[in-house]
Amino acid sequence: ALASFHNPGIVRVLRYFRANETAYMVMDYETGQPLQRWLVGRLPLDKTMLLRIVRPLLDGLAVVHGTGFLHRDIKPENIYIRADGSPVLLDFGSARRVEADGSDQALTAVLTPGFAPAEQYHRHGKQGPWTDLYALAGVMYWMVTGNRPMEAFARLREDTMPTAAEIGNK
């Protein structure tokens, strides 16, 4: 199913296969640079530039989510800015199909503090499109403020993370 995704906002998976008790994906080679390198000297981003990056990623996620899959590891390191300036979401190695009830068939926890929502910290946490959207919102926060978001559980205990508007007004 991953090989059937065709959208400019997500890397194209050409082939998926298993060998030696391991799963492999062959993907398009993308030229450009990682988002965090591309953003050096550009932070914080204004609304126009933020939307130029985020909209194609949201369009790509709509394709992924429409087939019942989740990326599960959206973070700045997995977003590339191509030579033409367009963004592409990479690294579908953690992607999994999720059941309609939000249960995940994966046994592995995938987390990047600040970008992973609370449900990814629990083996049986219910995941859905909201899981990827939380992570993308964390990337947006970082692009607007220049600060990585707080870890989800730290925010659940005591949310001291300043809003993007508060940081922008300093």
Give names to the regions the model predicted:
Residues 6-9:
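Flexible N-lobe loop architecture of eukaryotic-like protein kinase catalytic domains
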Residues 20-34, 38:
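Conserved short submotifs of the Hanks-type protein kinase catalytic core
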Residues 58-69:
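Protein kinase catalytic-loop region centered on the HRD/HxD motif
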Residues 114-170:
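C-terminal lobe helix-coil module of Hanks-type protein kinase domains
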Residues 53-54:
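Activation segment signature within eukaryotic-like protein kinase domains
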Residues 81-85:
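Activation-loop N-terminal segment of eukaryotic-like protein kinases
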Residues 16:
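Activation-segment/catalytic-loop signature of the eukaryotic protein kinase fold
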